[in-house]
């Protein structure tokens, strides 16, 4: 077997400071972890509410595993559909205010499955230019015509929709991140709702980074912006603010039935194990209650504090609304140098490079958790300012 081609590509990536590798973290996803045996402040986890080591989730996982075993043995359409799956789906539908919900094994599997399952060659998908990679791949798998509009630019989107209108054959769908994963900014959902009504199409929101975090009840970006019930398809994850693993779509009953029959990532995957599903149920109960509200309030205070310390280093659109803080650094080499220096100082924050972000828009992507301590964040902000000015 010829391996030279792949090795040359890896060598080129290394020369360009673009080679990715794995770092070994020990312990739970707390505010501090052991990174290669060294204590560091964890500033790059999506465990926004700090639920990944919550005693209620751990106990629920252990109880379900003792009762139901470690795995389901098959896909949901064979023998892998359990009462726990249905309980969590019912709670998620109620949480998002929809008729029904359907679990997927990961956010990537959800977006690719939803778009591939619902859309086809006669359909058109309108997709924000900074949507997550799983949405981009889902659009490709669907075989629908994909029209990409400039980031958050609803005026440009309307022009593109008007241009497509005379050619319309099938279903139209607008798809957007709710909270954009690399910039932390919000989709203009009220304006997108107006467009979807004007052009009689569907609106799908990937709220992986908003679910559990935004809104008085943690229902996400739609609740925060006052248009939750106008969203047709809500995609969310259980592996970020909810502290577990898996993903879901919530929407009309007919959509869920259709996806059960057409979404390949659902049909051909062994279902989520009982312990994982039970943790999702426990997490949702916390998010819905007073503890979840208190954690969101604390997280918001920390977001305001941290972004306020780094105002000069952040894009102007960053206002501390979300726990994603993009600290722009430009090119790969200074980005990775800054990340390595901060790691040596006990701050674990990853450098983000293309293709995850556009050329020239490399960054340190800091993410906050409700369990972070003020003094740790102040020290981290001071060190970030120092490395950026070096």
UniProtKB/Swiss-Prot annotation:
Any Gene Ontology biological process: biotin biosynthetic process
Its annotated pathway reads: Cofactor biosynthesis; biotin biosynthesis
Among Gene3D superfamilies, the record links this protein to: Aspartate Aminotransferase, domain 1, Type I PLP-dependent aspartate aminotransferase-like (Major domain)
- EC category name: transferase
Q: Which terms does the record give in the GO molecular function aspect?
A: 8-amino-7-oxononanoate synthase activity; pyridoxal phosphate binding
* Subunit architecture: Homodimer.
Which PANTHER family does this UniProt record tie to the protein? 8-AMINO-7-OXONONANOATE SYNTHASE, CLASS II AMINOTRANSFERASE/8-AMINO-7-OXONONANOATE SYNTHASE
Protein family:
Belongs to the class-II pyridoxal-phosphate-dependent aminotransferase family. BioF subfamily.
Primary role: Catalyzes the decarboxylative condensation of pimeloyl-[acyl-carrier protein] and L-alanine to produce 8-amino-7-oxononanoate (AON), [acyl-carrier protein], and carbon dioxide.
Q: What is this protein called?
A: Putative 8-amino-7-oxononanoate synthase
Q: Source species, please?
A: Syntrophotalea carbinolica (strain DSM 2380 / NBRC 103641 / GraBd1) (Pelobacter carbinolicus)
Q: Which gene encodes it?
A: bioF
């Amino acid at each position: 077997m010829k391996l030279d081609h792949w090795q040359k590509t890896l060598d080129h990536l290394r020369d360009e400071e673009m080679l990715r590798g794995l770092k070994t973290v020990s312990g739970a996803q707390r505010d501090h972890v052991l990174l290669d045996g060294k204590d560091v402040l964890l500033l790059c986890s999506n465990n926004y509410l700090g639920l990944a080591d919550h005693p209620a989730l751990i106990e629920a996982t252990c109880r379900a595993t003792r009762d139901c075993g470690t795995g389901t043995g098959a896909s949901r359409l064979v023998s892998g559909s359990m009462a726990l799956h249905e309980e969590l789906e019912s709670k998620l539908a109620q949480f998002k205010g929809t008729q029904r919900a359907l679990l997927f094994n990961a956010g990537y599997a959800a977006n690719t499955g939803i778009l591939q399952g619902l859309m086809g060659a006669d359909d058109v998908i309108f997709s924000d230019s900074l949507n997550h990679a799983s949405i981009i791949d889902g659009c490709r798998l669907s075989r629908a015509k994909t029209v990409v509009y400039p980031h958050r630019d609803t005026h440009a989107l309307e022009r593109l929709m008007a241009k497509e209108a005379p050619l319309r054959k099938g279903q139209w769908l607008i798809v957007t991140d709710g909270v954009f994963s690399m910039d932390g900014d919000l989709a203009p959902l009220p304006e997108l709702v107006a467009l979807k009504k004007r052009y009689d199409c569907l609106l799908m929101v990937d709220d992986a980074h908003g679910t559990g975090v935004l809104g008085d009840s943690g229902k996400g970006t739609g609740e925060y912006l006052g248009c939750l019930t106008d969203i047709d398809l809500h995609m969310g994850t259980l592996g970020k603010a909810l502290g577990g693993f898996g993903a879901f779509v919530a929407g009309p009953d007919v959509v869920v039935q259709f996806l059960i029959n057409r979404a390949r990532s659902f049909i051909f995957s062994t279902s989520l194990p009982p312990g994982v599903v039970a943790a999702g149920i426990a997490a949702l109960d916390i998010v819905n209650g007073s503890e979840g509200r208190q954690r969101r309030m604390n997280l918001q205070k920390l977001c305001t504090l941290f972004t306020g310390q780094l105002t000069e280093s952040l894009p102007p659109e960053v206002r501390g609304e979300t726990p994603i803080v993009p600290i722009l650094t430009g090119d790969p080499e200074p980005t990775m140098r800054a990340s390595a220096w901060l790691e040596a100082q006990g701050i674990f924050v990853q450098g983000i490079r293309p293709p995850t972000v556009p050329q020239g828009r490399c960054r340190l992507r800091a993410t906050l958790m409700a369990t972070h301590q003020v003094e740790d964040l102040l020290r981290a902000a001071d060190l970030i300012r120092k490395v950026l000015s070096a």
